[in-house]
Amino acid sequence: MSNTQNPNIHCSFCGKSQDDVKKLIAGSDVYICNECIELSTRILEEELREEQDSEMLEVKTPKEMFDHLNEYVIGQEKAKRALAVAVYNHYKRINFAASKIAEDIELQKSNILLIGPTGSGKTFLAQTLAKSLNVPFAIADATSLTEAGYVGEDVENILLKLLQASDFNIERAERGIIYIDEIDKIAKKSENVSITRDVSGEGVQQALLKIIEGTVASVPPQGGRKHPNQEMIQIDTKNILFIVGGAFDGIEEIVKQRLGEKIIGFGANNKKLNDDDSYMQEIIAEDIQKFGLIPEFIGRLPIVAALERLTEEDLIQILTEPKNALIKQYKQLLLFDNVELEFEDEALMAIARKAIERKTGARGLRSIIEEVMMDIMFEVPSHEEITKVIINEAVVDGKAEPQMIREAKKK
């Protein structure tokens, strides 16, 4: 209320008297003027805006994410596009919720299923995207998970890995990305696919359902099984993006059966090799369910992207072109010893062929190069006269020694 009886009354905050302001509001032995009220209101509004801005994530456009992936990932154009759009929409959804615009509309989370052979780049795609967005990222192996009551990891331990990746910053963790690999290995037993282990089958799918769709989970900070008296960390998973991946070996046969195309007779193997990738692009939810994932679990993974088997040409590009290309890395390692490293084209082709023969894809390239480079990297630092090392096809195949160019004295 305004007080005009006592001329000594003044604002308790700015010290102005009642004659210098329009209004003085009285409290219990405290007074505040209209100017201080207006100032405090502005301060509060600014703080609220700043808090809201801090909740908003800076999201790259799908094109920007796609271009970033192209710097590191060779091939898989369709999968990269699908992943870029899905991740963009996911973080746009989080910003939409933080902005409190159209609160009567609820945008649901769209988790992602990546299907592709071993070494096709599923894990690397997810990892590269998370790094470009500067959000916490964790990788889990579905085969290590078991349902409650069995020996193994609780599904909540996946969230612990994300917390660790965010230095236990819960707010950052709640906007992170989790990649669960080998998801096809927890398919339930079915007449179409032989799965020997059911302990981590349908039961684990059921356990994963809640954290994938969004729940407040209790996470043991030290990991392991939960104990009644153990202090827990509460983490809300509604804004965590889950990307799950698996090879789904044999699912192309399920697709063929659905499409009514059975490959039999002479030349079947050649046709199979040529057509498997195209069949993988035709996968629908029905095929995944027939493989062994339960409908409820599939429903939480509305975006499905199939990765193609990497060709010899793809693997050579992976070896030489990306920013983190293995050949560039090994060249730099020898350059530290002032030695030039050269891989002949035939050597690169031989490395790619080995990876295909071993069915390891891009994942196996490093181990093959390590086999080739081990003795070289052991010997070179002790021989200052060596200035260049040349590796050809015979060296990769273990049939010859690398050519080493020497000078009388190394400068």
Curated annotation (Swiss-Prot):
ATP binds at P117, T118, G119, S120, G121, K122, T123, F124. The keyword Flavoprotein does not apply. Residues 1-52 form the ClpX-type ZB domain. Zn(2+) binds at C11, C14, C33, C36. It comes from the Bacteria. GO terms for cellular component: HslUV protease complex. PANTHER family: ATP-DEPENDENT CLP PROTEASE ATP-BINDING SUBUNIT CLPX-LIKE, MITOCHONDRIAL, ATP-DEPENDENT CLP PROTEASE ATP-BINDING SUBUNIT CLPX-LIKE, MITOCHONDRIAL-RELATED. Component of the ClpX-ClpP complex. Forms a hexameric ring that, in the presence of ATP, binds to fourteen ClpP subunits assembled into a disk-like structure with a central cavity, resembling the structure of eukaryotic proteasomes. Belongs to the ClpX chaperone family. This is ATP-dependent Clp protease ATP-binding subunit ClpX. It comes from Lactococcus lactis subsp. lactis (strain IL1403) (Streptococcus lactis).
